[in-house]
């Protein structure tokens, strides 16, 4: 039996990137901190960024990003957000 893969999206603000294949994306963490980065357009759907859930605890979700955040050098490929910021595609 195989597990069904569901796409998970993070609510964010999307604007035009520097190149035709990317968009500038800004988002908030669970504490209201502001973060941004440039992400491939293939990772964006209806103004939301496709992410992977790494961990969940109560109403918080640690998500992996399909790229790096500008404000977090090194380990900027994940962010903790509120569950209400996440949409799971059926």
Model region roles, listed by residue range:
Residues 3-86:
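Basic/aromatic-rich interaction segments and small domains that mediate binding to polyanionic partners
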